Every structure is written in C-alpha cells, then in structure tokens.
C-alpha cells in the first residue's frame, strides 16, 4: 500500500485544498530510522521543515515535522510512519485550510 495515497496526489488527479499540520514522531527503535527517512523523502515536497532531537537519557528521538498537504496525504504519511516498529506518530492540524 505504500505510496498509494501519495501517488494519487502527486500524479495530479485533481488539485486538493491543503492544510498546515505538525506531525510529532517518537522513535524508540533506531532500526526503523532508515525506513523512516525513506518515507520522509517520498513525501518531501509536502514537508515545510523538520526538527530532530535525540534524547539519549531515555534512548529515544523526537522528530517534529511541519507539513502543507491535503488531509489525505497527511493522514497517509502519519499512518505509514506509525506502522513502523518502535515508532509512533500523531498529527495536529491548523484550524484554517
């Protein structure tokens, strides 16, 4: 299923209204880092900015993404990330489109 939602919008089916969202990601299993970075690269055109903070005392990394994308793309990205082992993700949306 990977990229199914992404391809729908990238291949220009129809213009969609975009939303600004912040996606918070907690990585507790570094073995998932390569796949996580691959997913983020795939959705790169929607990512406004990224901040990563390694927190060594707890052995986790916190990543915050700012995105501007259709809601289906944001949901797809968040879902793909959240299905990785040792990774959780949540999105918070702006009130306005």
Regions found by a protein language model. Give the residues of each.
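Long, contiguous binding/interaction regions
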Residues: 8-97
